[in-house]
């Protein structure tokens, strides 16, 4: 059974159902939150109950659809929200205001901004609320279906490129890879971006045999070149690596060893399995290839460069901002100090690590303080990795590498 971050029932196009997996409760509790309105979408995005740039864009778009359908089903609600359904210009103006509000939930991720720009265009070209409803439904269905298809394509593109590169470099045998944050099914419509490449690498390692003959550059009797271990970084301070990526790897039975962010240099130096690549996602890639991603990504890129490990960013075309020239212009979101000073998780028995249940027989969530409550905290959600530290950008259109001058040519995607 595949993991689902978003449950979208589209069987009734005029009465869709949207539920979002509360990722703050993972890995011990699986609970879905209904999304009926833009306010609901804003809340689950802002609170990081859903995260990952593609998933944020999907949930944001779906929340507009559910609000539009809710308005048509409940005229009383429309009055409470100050919509005048008898005046299309009023509805149009109000929706534009609501879309701007939704955009403020997570300003760094470009996917949400791109999707909302598309939706503004659909709104301006709609004759009434019913027309907008129909067009928006088609848009979100395409958004979700394309995201999944692109993820699978990116997974194969990245896996094949790495394996071919390793053979060209003269490497043969088993290897491991690094990743940070969560870029899998929980961050997308399914399969994942960077974790999708890792899934594809694992699938290829499992299927190696007569149907996958060795490359001409490989020695005839050499061990096959295959990924056998993943090293996900914990990803402080929100622990997406330990809570979510480790959860997905265990679910898919992909061999993995969880490490803290500060262990990566020593792990690379001492690992009996050579670590040959790092795959990370992106919340925004600008024109020159500079990449905004989860805090700690830049640090990982520096370490990889020191050890000669290939560093890849994996993201669809929708994550590329072809207007902003460099990472210096990216607005980096800063989170609340309490998210740093406190750790939220499931209360467990000290001896056997089983979850402690509340009165409803559900795992009990708890917050634990790990820093003085009055200490100053700096808590950026993202950092910017300069393109000089990136070996390749994996997209659904192929793998982009730098030219002889050290520049990416991402404009070829547009």
From Swiss-Prot:
Tell me which residues this entry annotates as catalytic: 283 (proton donor)
Question: What highest taxon heads this organism's lineage?
Answer: Eukaryota
List the SUPFAM superfamilies.
NagB/RpiA/CoA transferase-like
Localization per record: Cytoplasm; Nucleus
Keyword tags: Amino-acid biosynthesis, Cytoplasm, Isomerase, Methionine biosynthesis, Nucleus
Residues flagged as site, Transition state stabilizer = 181
Query: What are the protein's GO molecular function terms?
Result: S-methyl-5-thioribose-1-phosphate isomerase activity
Question: What EC designation does it have?
Answer: 5.3.1.23
What Gene Ontology biological process does one annotation of this record name? L-methionine salvage from methylthioadenosine
Q: Which reaction does it catalyse?
A: 5-(methylsulfanyl)-alpha-D-ribose 1-phosphate = 5-(methylsulfanyl)-D-ribulose 1-phosphate
Pathway(s) of this molecule:
Amino-acid biosynthesis; L-methionine biosynthesis via salvage pathway; L-methionine from S-methyl-5-thio-alpha-D-ribose 1-phosphate: step 1/6
* Coiled-coil stretches noted in the UniProt entry, renumbered to this chain: none
Record's compositionally biased regions (Polar residues): 205-215
**Similarity annotation:** Belongs to the eIF-2B alpha/beta/delta subunits family. MtnA subfamily.
Describe its function: Catalyzes the interconversion of methylthioribose-1-phosphate (MTR-1-P) into methylthioribulose-1-phosphate (MTRu-1-P).
- HAMAP family, per the entry: Salvage_MtnA
Q: What is the name listed in the Swiss-Prot or TrEMBL entry for this protein?
A: Methylthioribose-1-phosphate isomerase
Provide the gene name from the record: MRI1
């Amino acid at each position: 059974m595949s993991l689902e971050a978003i449950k979208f029932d589209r069987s009734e196009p005029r009465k869709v159902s949207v539920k979002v997996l509360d990722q703050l409760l993972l890995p011990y509790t699986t609970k879905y939150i209904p999304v009926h309105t833009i306010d609901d979408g804003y809340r689950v995005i802002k609170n990081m109950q859903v995260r990952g740039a593609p998933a944020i864009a999907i949930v944001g778009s779906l929340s507009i659809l559910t609000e539009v359908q809710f308005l048509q089903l409940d005229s009383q609600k429309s009055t409470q929200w100050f919509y005048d359904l008898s005046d299309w210009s009023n509805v149009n103006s109000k929706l534009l205001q609501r879309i701007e509000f939704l955009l403020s939930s997570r300003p760094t991720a470009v996917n949400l901004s791109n999707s909302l720009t598309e939706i503004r265009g659909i709104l301006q070209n709609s004759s009434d609320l019913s027309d907008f409803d129909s067009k928006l439904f088609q848009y979100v269905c395409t958004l979700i279906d394309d995201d999944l298809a692109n993820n699978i394509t990116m997974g194969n593109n990245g896996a094949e490129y790495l394996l071919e590169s390793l053979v060209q470099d003269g490497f043969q045998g088993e290897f491991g890879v690094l990743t940070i944050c969560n870029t899998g099914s929980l961050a997308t419509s399914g399969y994942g971006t960077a974790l999708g490449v890792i899934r594809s690498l694992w699938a290829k390692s499992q299927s190696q045999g007569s149907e996958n003959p060795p490359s001409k550059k490989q020695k005839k009797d050499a061990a096959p070149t295959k990924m056998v271990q993943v090293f996900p970084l914990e990803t402080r301070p929100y622990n997406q690596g330990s809570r979510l990526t480790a959860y997905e790897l265990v679910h898919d039975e992909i061999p993995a060893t969880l490490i803290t962010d500060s262990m990566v240099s020593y792990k690379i130096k001492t690992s009996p399995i050579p670590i040959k690549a790092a795959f990370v996602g992106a919340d925004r890639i600008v024109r020159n290839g500079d990449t905004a991603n989860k805090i700690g990504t830049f640090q990982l890129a520096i370490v990889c460069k020191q050890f000669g490990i290939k560093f890849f960013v994996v993201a669809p075309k929708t994550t590329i901002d072809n207007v902003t020239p460099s990472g210096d212009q990216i607005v980096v979101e800063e989170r609340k100090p309490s998210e740093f000073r406190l750790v939220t998780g499931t209360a467990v028995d000290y001896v056997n690590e089983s979850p402690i249940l509340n009165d409803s027989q559900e795992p009990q969530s708890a917050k634990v303080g790990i820093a003085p409550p009055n200490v100053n905290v700096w808590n950026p959600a993202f950092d910017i990795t300069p393109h000089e530290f990136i070996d390749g950008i994996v997209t659904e259109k192929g793998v982009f590498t730098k030219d002889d001058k050290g520049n990416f040519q991402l404009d070829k995607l547009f």
